[in-house]
Amino acid sequence: MSEETTMARGRVHKDPRSPAEFRAMREILGISGPGLARMLDVNPRTQRAWDYKWIAPDRAWEVIDGRIEWICRTVDALLAEMDGADTDEEAVYVVYPNDEAAARAGIGVPASWYLAALGIVVLMARREGRIVRLEYPPKE
């Protein structure tokens, strides 16, 4: 595809990250392909092409990069909370089974994104020898 064609389709992105990296980041962040396609108002086939063969456009990378920044802030904040606690003390974090439950709890992102962030917190905390669990809220 020529640069002119690429520019006409709005797919110019000078970032060196590949479709494989785009897919890996999207999946580890808990962002579904169909969900991203809806969010960006593109055909799901277009989004799948970003995972396998086309360089994703700036606006798709902005979603990915925004989630990465949010997760890093969330991970840093939660790990900082643990710093003052005894290493043997168990930390329990609540995650939500769906977007509706997350919204009711005041979580400002989809449940899958929040779950991905807390999953990373668990990995990082356990790496430091902490005891961490994730739980769903009790049924009402």
Predicted regions and their residues:
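Helix-turn-helix/homeodomain-like alpha-helical modules used for DNA recognition
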Residues: R73-E140
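Short, charged amphipathic recognition helices of the HTH superfamily
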Residues: G30-G35
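Recognition helix of helix-turn-helix/homeodomain-like DNA-binding domains
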Residues: V42-A56
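Conserved hydrophobic/aromatic packing and binding residues within compact polymer-binding modules
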Residues: F22, L36-A37, Q47-W50
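A short, Lys/Arg-rich alpha-helix, primarily the initiator
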Residues: S2-I28
